[in-house]
C-alpha cells in the first residue's frame, strides 16, 4: 500500500487492486501547489468523500467525468453529484458498508456539518458528515476521520474495526485541534500510524502539526506528519 498526502484532507491510496482519491480538494488547495492534478488522478478507480463541504468535494465532479472513477458519498451528497452529471456513484449512510473489488468502506459518525453553498449564497445541507473506515484485502486498514471533534464513541469504532492507520484532522476552528486530536488517538484508538491532516491550508487554521506531534509523544502510535506530495509505503 502506498499513501500520498496531497495537502489538506486529500489523499491518494494505492493498493494492488485499487487507486483511490479521498476528498480530492486540489485545484484551489494552496497545499497542493506545485503538484499536477493529472499525475495524482492517473489511473484512479474510486473517489471517496467524507462530506459535502467544498474543501473535501473539491474537484470530484471534473475528475469523475474525466476518469470514469466510481464516486462514493452519503446519499444526499450522491444525489447532488448526480445532478452535476456524475453518473458512476455508490451511495451509503452512517453505519452502512459498501463493498468494492479489493476493499470495503463503512460510513461512521463524525461531529461536523455537510453542505454546499449555491451561486445565490444559500447553504444547502447534504446529509451528515462522516468518517470512512476502509478495509482492504490483505492490506493495512485505514480510518479517515473526516472533519470531526473528539467523541467517546470513537472507542466503539476502534472496537469494531481495529484500524491500523488514522487520517486525523488537527487544524482547529472547524475540527478538533492538535492536542485534542492526540488525546482522541491515545484514548480511543490503537493506530500503528496516525497521519495528521486538515491543517496548514488556510490562515485561520493551525499551520503546523507541532501540537499533535507533541501530544503523541510517549504513545505506541507513530505520529507521521507528512509534507504535501510525500508518500508512505506500508
UniProtKB/Swiss-Prot annotation:
SUPFAM superfamilies: Metallo-hydrolase/oxidoreductase. InterPro entries: Metallo-B-lactamas, RibonucZ/Hydroxyglut_hydro, UPF0173, UPF0173_UPF0282_UlaG_hydrolase. Keywords: Hydrolase. GO terms for molecular function: hydrolase activity. Belongs to the UPF0173 family. NCBIfam families: PRK00685.1. This is UPF0173 metal-dependent hydrolase RHE_CH01853.
Amino acid at each position: 500500500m502506498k499513501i500520498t498526502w496531497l495537502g489538506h484532507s486529500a489523499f491518494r491510496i494505492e493498493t494492488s487492486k485499487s487507486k483511490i482519491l479521498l476528498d480530492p480538494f486540489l485545484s484551489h488547495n494552496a497545499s497542493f501547489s506545485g503538484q499536477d492534478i493529472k499525475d495524482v488522478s492517473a489511473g484512479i478507480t474510486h473517489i471517496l468523500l467524507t462530506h459535502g463541504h467544498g474543501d473535501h468535494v473539491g474537484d470530484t465532479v471534473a475528475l469523475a467525468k474525466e476518469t470514469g472513477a466510481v464516486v462514493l458519498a452519503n446519499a444526499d451528497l450522491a444525489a447532488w453529484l448526480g445532478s452535476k452529471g456524475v453518473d458512476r456513484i455508490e451511495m451509503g449512510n452512517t453505519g452502512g458498508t459498501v463493498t468494492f473489488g479489493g476493499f470495503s468502506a463503512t460510513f461512521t459518525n463524525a461531529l461536523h456539518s455537510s453542505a454546499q453553498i449555491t451561486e445565490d449564497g444559500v447553504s444547502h445541507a447534504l446529509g451528515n458528515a462522516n468518517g470512512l473506515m476502509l478495509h482492504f484485502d490483505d492490506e493495512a486498514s485505514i480510518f479517515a476521520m473526516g472533519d470531526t471533534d473528539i467523541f467517546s464513541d470513537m472507542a466503539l469504532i476502534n472496537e469494531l474495526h481495529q484500524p491500523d492507520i488514522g487520517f486525523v484532522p488537527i487544524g482547529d476552528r472547524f475540527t478538533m485541534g492538535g492536542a485534542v486530536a492526540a488525546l482522541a488517538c491515545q484514548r480511543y484508538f490503537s493506530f500503528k500510524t496516525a497521519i495528521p491532516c486538515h491543517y496548514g491550508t488556510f490562515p485561520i487554521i493551525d499551520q503546523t502539526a507541532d501540537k499533535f506531534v507533541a501530544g503523541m509523544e510517549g504513545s505506541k502510535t507513530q505520529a507521521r506528519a507528512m509534507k504535501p506530495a510525500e508518500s508512505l509505503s506500508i
